Amino acid sequence: MDPLWKQYNENKGYIYQNNISLYLLVDIKTAAKKTHNVLGEILHHYKPMLSYVVSDSLIQGAVTIILSGNKPDIEDIKNIEERFVFMDGRLSDVGKNISNIIMPIISMDWLDHFTWSGLGHMPDKELIILNEIVQKVHLENKQIRFWASPDNKRGWNILENVGVDLINTDKLNQFSTHKFQN
């Protein structure tokens, strides 16, 4: 958190100079409740920089912490008076009336739904399914991301064209060049 805090202070309240918020996904691999409690203690010190919820009201910050992996129960999260974390959901969470101030993102394993690897044309049937999933998530005003999606220009183009909000990549330089060329 300290490097983000330094950047936040250098940019007068933002991580990026263009005032775009940053999502920091924390993939919990340990005991959910215990980890969440420790995180809460740590994150409180960075409150001016963070998005948080107080009495069901969202205070948007420069950094939004999203818990993924072994997450605490939604009911445990809901009942916290001042909360510095949000939940990463799954497609199975769509349609359950989970508020965006609890679960702003739906994440999915690409390989659970698609066979296309980013080479050649994406099969029409898979493109239709992809569009339907994105629309379903967007109807709840949530953002969508896939992990293990095709990590190349063709894959990025498809994801951008259908409206995927957050694109995972291990090729940061190539993706950055791709984004600024388009």
Model-derived features with residue positions:
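Catalytic cores of phosphodiester-bond hydrolases, prominently lipid phosphodiesterases
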Residues: M1-N182
